[in-house]
């Protein structure tokens, strides 16, 4: 069945920050991510594909206002191909804990799929380090999906040589908790077009033309508020498609239990809106080129103008996009 929304790609997940400079250092020098600043208070990071982490600085006061006991269930996951590498990463995390302001290094857990452990960083975000075969969770899905835009910057499937403390091979997943897996699966498949695979009664993987997946888990968490700053995002090809998507969500608000549907706005260089679902999870649909944030990594470093290209004389990324395909081409359209 054709989904109600035509969303091309799992673009990003959000993380909140206290200090962007310290977080850049942690992401780049410890975790081994490809990271750049998009403004004095924001960053974007990736590893192994173009599904990105978007970091936004709220500061200590802003973070203190939000009671978010669910953050552990909104973690990002990074893969090593062997258990020995995970065990070594666990030891290295203790060795460098103070240098990178890591709040906690969790116990090393030996599970059926291999060892794993959790890190709690200075910003209160959680990171899972785990053993996973090359390709991440793709082995659980039938057949291939269209990863053209997910891997447009990775033609040989390899990442750049890492000089970081940890050297994971892939950001394989972001985690999202739900209340009722059956109801949530119907929403994700029928509305968003996410390809879902159940791993058990209370666990499900979802992908959308992506290498990275969403790892859905059913929980009994009582407090589920303050999730807008930790939303998951999709990109579409133009403002008019953003508007059309919002109308479809409004039309299906009662059917699928959408709680809050925000008005569209222009922020961080794009036009889009956020909304929350029946599980109080937050989502974003925004106008961005095919492949999402990957064009930012084509700019040769941190963005000199907030959320805009470093190419001289170009003040809007739309000028560097093919108007027909919405592909980033890197030269100004005239």
Q: PLM ranges: what are they?
A:
Residues 5, 14-61, 175-218:
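Core segments of cupin and vicinal oxygen chelate
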Residues 6-16, 25-28, 34-115, 233, ...:
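Ordered, small/hydrophobic-rich secondary-structure cores
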């Amino acid at each position: 069945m054709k989904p109600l929304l035509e969303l091309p790609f799992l673009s990003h997940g959000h993380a909140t920050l206290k200090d962007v400079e310290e977080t850049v250092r942690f992401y780049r020098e410890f975790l081994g991510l490809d990271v750049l600043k998009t403004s004095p208070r924001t960053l974007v990071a990736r590893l192994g594909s173009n599904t990105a982490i978007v970091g936004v600085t709220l500061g200590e006061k802003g973070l203190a206002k939000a009671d978010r006991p669910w953050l552990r269930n909104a973690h990002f996951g990074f893969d090593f191909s062997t258990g020995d590498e995970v065990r070594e990463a666990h030891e290295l995390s203790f060795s460098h804990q103070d240098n990178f302001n890591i709040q906690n290094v969790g116990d090393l857990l030996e599970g059926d799929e291999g060892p794993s452990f959790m890190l709690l960083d200075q910003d209160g975000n959680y990171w899972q380090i785990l053993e996973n075969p090359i390709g991440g969770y793709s082995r659980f899905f039938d057949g291939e999906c269209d990863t053209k835009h997910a891997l447009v910057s990775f033609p040989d499937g390899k990442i750049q040589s890492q000089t970081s403390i940890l050297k994971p091979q892939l950001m394989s997943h972001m985690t999202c908790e739900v209340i009722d897996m059956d109801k949530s699966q119907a929403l994700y498949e029928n509305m968003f077009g996410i390809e879902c695979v159940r791993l058990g009664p209370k666990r499900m993987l979802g992908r959308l033309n992506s290498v990275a997946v969403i790892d859905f888990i059913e929980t009994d968490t009582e407090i589920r508020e303050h999730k807008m700053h930790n939303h998951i995002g999709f990109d579409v090809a133009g403002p008019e498609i953003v508007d059309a998507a919002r109308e479809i969500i409004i039309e299906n608000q009662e059917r699928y239990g959408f709680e809050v549907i925000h008005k569209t706005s222009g922020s961080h260089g794009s036009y889009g809106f956020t909304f929350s679902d029946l599980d109080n999870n937050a989502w974003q649909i925004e106008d961005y080129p095919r492949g999402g944030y990957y064009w930012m990594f084509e700019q040769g470093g941190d963005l000199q103008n907030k959320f805009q290209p470093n190419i001289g004389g170009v003040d809007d990324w739309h000028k560097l996009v093919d108007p027909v395909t919405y592909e980033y081409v890197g030269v100004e359209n005239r």
